[in-house]
C-alpha cells in the first residue's frame, strides 16, 4: 500500500511539473509572415485630406470634456473629436471618413497638443481601413509633423507621418480646417 501511495505521489508530482513547464511560453510563437500578408512588397501611399474641427453651432464635432487649467495656453484641456475628413477644403465637399479620438493641451508655454486619433476611411478602396496618428501638434506652427503609428485593414502594419497645415480658422469660435498630407508605408 505504501508503494502505491508513493507511486501515485510521484505521478502527480511529475504531471504537475510537466503541465506547468510551458505556462510562460505558450502565449507567443513565431509565425510565418505570409499568413499576415507580410511577404508582399511594402508600398508608400500619399493622400491628402481636410480635417474639420467644429466647436460651434448645434452639431459640434469637437467637445471639450476637461477645461484648461488656465486660459492662456489650453494646458490640461481635453477635447474628444469626431471630425469629418473631406477631399477638399470646403466642409460640404466629399466626405472620405472621420477623424476620431482626442487632443489635449500638453504645453504650458505655447499652444501645443497631444493628438491621438484614428482616420477611419468610409469610401472607395480604403473603406473600413484606418491609420492611427499619435504625436505633438504645435498648432501655431506653419507645418506640424506627427507620426503614423499603426493602422488596420489595407493599412495593417502601417507606419509613416503626416504633415498638418491650417487652411482656415475662425478666431472667435475656434472652428478650423486643417490639411493633413499623409505618407503611409504599408503592405
UniProtKB/Swiss-Prot annotation:
One of its GO terms (biological process) is phenylpropanoid biosynthetic process. Residues 1-20 form the signal peptide. It comes from the Eukaryota. Glycans are attached at residues 71, 92, 127. Its main location: secreted. Keywords: Apoplast, Glycoprotein, Secreted, Signal. Pfam families: Dirigent. One of its GO terms (cellular component) is apoplast. Gene3D superfamilies: Allene oxide cyclase-like. It is found in: Secreted, Extracellular space, Apoplast. Homodimer. Belongs to the plant dirigent protein family. Dirigent proteins impart stereoselectivity on the phenoxy radical-coupling reaction, yielding optically active lignans from two molecules of coniferyl alcohol in the biosynthesis of lignans, flavonolignans, and alkaloids and thus plays a central role in plant secondary metabolism. PANTHER family: NUCLEOPORIN-RELATED (PTHR21495). This is Dirigent protein 20.
